[in-house]
Amino acid sequence: MEYTLLGKTGLKISRVGLGGIPIQKVDEEQTKKLLHLLAQQGVNYIDTARGYTVSEQYLGYALEGIRSQFVLATKSMSRTKEAMEKDIQISLSNLRTDYIDLYQVHNPSAQDLEQVMAQGGALEALQEAKAAGKIGHIGITLHSADLFAQALELPWVETIMFPYNIVENQGEDYIAACSDKNIGFICMKPLAGGALEDATLALRYVMQNPHVSVVIPGMADEKEVFQNIQAVEDKRPLQADELSKIQEIRKTLGTQFCRRCNYCAPCTQGISIPGVFLMEGYFKRYDLKQWAYSRYSAMAKNASDCVGCGVCESRCPYHLPIREMLKKAKDTFANYK
């Protein structure tokens, strides 16, 4: 297994890690079996989140006796100091540890980020927890390229997590900038949320980029572990047939795939268009139907509120048929009721 340093954190991590979303689909014993296999194979980076229902709890159970073999990262969507303090304590309890290596601000909007950094914001809780030795380092996870650019200039940001894959490469320049600033870059969504069926090709594409510190595909079984490790350790340049397949994937998938750049905003009806498509992806491709449906239903406005004005489509740099895509998402969730 190849290891690298996670930017200025100085943490020594494997180039491939565990993305914790699929843990929600298995049980504690399967999670324990998975983590012991990862430890045997030298995979030492685990990412989870407060928002991934039982993921933290199952990982905590599975880490008993082997916690020291892993670099553990989690994240919270809390934006205030009080709420973040509570979430840090819950994470410590769930994960059955007295120390979390990396705690991240989870997917803030521009407005959320202002709140996080304001007086009484979540950053205060994170910095106090770091000073107290409860967490080691502070990072941020994002889906907006504009916020990625902003995060690069924030002195407290030690790591940045952002989607990067065959069809989502809008953050490439900022990923390179992470190296310049010694910020660890964590690649999420390497399989585009399950939209890319050839996992080996998807991971080989990501690992061609020398500025990626670690890639965190979701894994839930032994086959996926060995397949992903083999792909990440394959250092050959992409071959002609692989490059041809990548172009074909971009041509086919790119016309119906939301990159979550948010240039379509603001929607005239207040719909979070990228949010709708994100939940639709979890529903269809991760097979997390109830989890995705509950989050979709909790949105103040969702796909059913679309009036078909088309303003979003005039702004989309990828010329996506957003109105048609929203109708499909609306039907997907309506049929689940």
Report residues per predicted region.
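Alpha-helix-loop-beta-strand connector modules within alpha/beta enzyme cores
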Residues: 56-75, 123-132, 182
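Short hydrophobic/aromatic-enriched beta-strand-loop microsegments
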Residues: 69-72, 157-165, 236-242
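Structured C-terminal cap/extension of enzyme domains
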Residues: 39-44, 173-187, 191-337
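N-terminal binding-site loop/beta-alpha segment at the start of enzyme catalytic domains
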Residues: 1-70
